[in-house]
From Swiss-Prot:
Record keywords: Cytoplasm, Gluconeogenesis, Glycolysis, Isomerase
Molecular function, one GO term: carbohydrate derivative binding
Protein name: Glucose-6-phosphate isomerase
Cellular compartment(s): Cytoplasm
Lineage: Bacteria, Pseudomonadati, Pseudomonadota, Betaproteobacteria, Burkholderiales
GO biological process, one term: glycolytic process
Family annotation (PANTHER family): GLUCOSE-6-PHOSPHATE ISOMERASE (PTHR11469:SF1)
Record function comment: Catalyzes the reversible isomerization of glucose-6-phosphate to fructose-6-phosphate.
């Protein structure tokens, strides 16, 4: 199946040509925006969240055609296959059952395994939080260091930061991912080996960055007084390869299992989230799962016309494949959600940044847009200039938390006002005539610089309060959005072959950096020159 061979495609293309030059300002004009208002018609709820799609460049007819596109592309069938545990990751011959990690139905796939591992996590987290689990000198754990990269880092880091307000104040959680030694070194400056627990997270337990950092941390413990025989008090492992964890030197009792039917970027709900559970406690971790389950149920049961993940995905396709948008922005007006854009970068681009269809043919249409973002209001003072007046179309997801999770409540109306005002300004713009009035007769030459084209599309997601449950729903919303887009593009969102070639060549280059001699013909001239400069700097 190719996207532009679907029966609905010509109708969508004709509809795009019909409305491409229409301006949102006109659709919101009082003469056109009668009851039910545009905001009422295009605001939908699900999983405890609300989404206002009204400031997007679409009409009722657009949504009807996009929903038809989803049905013709088999979105519902792909969704149902994923939940049923079918092989939806054909290139690796695997299911993608991250939803099973938060299911509560006894007949859901792998429930006995999931429940047993979560109970083990809870016992361990309670022991660490209560002080029953101590370091080698008998001191309680005050620092948890999570070592992992990609999905073993981005998800847990994002959630721990977001839920800081409900986390225990007795334990500081640190995250180390980069093979650059500066990342680990800066954490080592802030921790005490007698009071530190390391969680090493790697599906294979062979990941270069993770194992390099893990070995350096283990050496640091020993160099700072921890007997090798006592390292079991300070190291636990999370992996789908328990034998390799034990080989590293972690006690078998300290191994937590993840499974190959859960992709790394979808894994925070598993033992990969052990650092989350230690920070917020098992009960609140269960609330996080419950929120994701709320969104799972909404995604499974709501008609596509009112289905938040489906609508999110389809609106993204509208801009990517018709308007030609090359990127989209996530702007959470919440400092607690500081790491959400980074998390979504991996979720969206590693999942859907593909050029091969499931059937092995190459696509002849764009797939994943570049995902980027920054919390508000910081972004307003960095790149919103380009969003308002630049020539590039960048669709935006605003995320607003309506009640603060901190005691400085007087700040919150200012934060929300900026969020809502930005969406209004991006939609309305300012005409040249309006700009001339502002510039006045004294400075008419200023008018073009005061003009805003407007018609910049935004979606605003509303969260009543940032809790473990609403955060779980928000994350699951984006997970399912990715699946919807993958189904329409007919690609596999659950593999990541694009990271392999660089890894393979990286091992070759690393060996050349320290070899006695290097054959200059082994690499292209640019890479050979880079290696030569680095060898000189390294003293080789």
């Amino acid at each position: 199946m190719t996207l532009n061979s679907l029966p609905v495609w010509p109708a969508l293309q004709a509809h795009y040509e019909e409305i491409r030059d229409a301006h949102l300002r006109d659709w919101f004009a009082p003469a056109n925006d009668r009851a039910p208002t545009r905001a009422e018609r295009f605001t939908f709820e699900g999983g405890g969240l609300a989404a206002d799609f009204s400031k997007n460049r679409l009409t009722d007819a657009t949504l009807a055609l996009l929903v038809r596109l989803a049905r013709e592309a088999g979105v519902e069938a792909r969704r149902d296959a994923m939940f049923a545990g079918e092989t939806v990751n054909p290139t690796e011959g695997r299911a993608a059952l991250h939803t099973a990690l938060r299911a509560n139905a006894a007949d859901a796939p792998f429930q006995a395994q999931v429940a047993a591992e979560r109970a083990k996590m809870a016992r361990f987290a309670d022991a660490v939080r209560s002080g029953a689990w101590t370091g080698y000198t008998g001191k309680r754990i005050r620092h948890v260091v999570n070592i992992g990269i990609g999905g073993s880092d981005l998800g847990p880091k994002m959630v721990v930061h977001a839920l800081h307000h409900v986390a225990t104040p007795d334990i500081a959680t640190h995250f180390v991912s980069n093979v650059d030694g500066a990342d680990l070194a800066r954490v080592l400056e802030r921790i005490d080996p007698e009071e530190t627990l390391a969680i090493i997270v790697s599906k294979t337990f062979t990941t270069l960055e993770t194992m390099t950092n893990a070995r350096s941390l283990r050496d640091w413990f020993v160099a700072n007084g921890c007997p090798e025989g006592a390292l079991a008090k300070h190291f636990v492992g999370v992996s789908a390869n328990p034998a390799e964890v034990v080989k590293f030197g972690i006690a078998e009792a300290n191994v937590f299992e993840m499974w190959d039917w859960v992709g790394g970027r979808y894994s925070l709900w598993s033992a990969v989230g052990l650092s989350i559970m230690i920070a917020i406690g098992p009960e609140r971790f269960d609330e996080l799962l419950a929120g994701a389950r709320d969104m799972d149920e909404h995604f499974r049961t709501a008609p596509l016309e009112r289905n938040l993940p489906a609508l999110q995905g389809l609106v993204g396709i509208w801009y990517r494949n018709f308007f030609g948008a090359q990127s989209y922005l996530v702007a959470p007006y919440s400092e607690a959600l500081h790491y959400l854009p980074s998390y979504l970068q991996q979720l969206e681009m590693e999942s859907n940044g593909k050029s091969a269809r499931i059937d092995g043919a190459f696509v002849d249409y764009p797939t994943s847009a570049v995902t980027w973002g920054e919390p508000g209001t910081n972004g307003q003072h960095a790149f919103f200039q380009m969003l308002h007046q630049g020539p590039t179309l960048v669709p935006i997801d605003f995320i607003a938390v309506l009640t603060p999770e901190h005691p400085l409540a007087s700040h919150h109306p200012k934060l929300l006002a900026n969020c809502f005002a930005q969406s209004e300004a991006l939609m309305l713009g300012r005409t040249l005539d309006e700009a001339r009035k502002i510039a006045g007769p004294a400075k008419p030459e200023l008018a073009p610089h005061l003009t805003f084209p407007g018609n910049r599309p935004t979606t605003t997601l509303l969260v009543d309060a940032l809790t473990p449950r609403t955060l779980g729903a928000l994350i699951a919303l984006y997970e399912h959005k990715v699946l919807v887009q993958a189904a329409v593009w007919n690609i596999n969102p659950f593999d990541q072959w694009g990271v392999e070639l660089g890894k393979i060549l990286g091992k070759v280059v690393e060996a050349d950096l320290t070899a006695a001699q290097v054959d200059p013909a082994k690499h292209d001239s640019s890479t050979s020159a880079l290696i030569a400069r680095a060898r000189k700097a390294l003293g080789e």
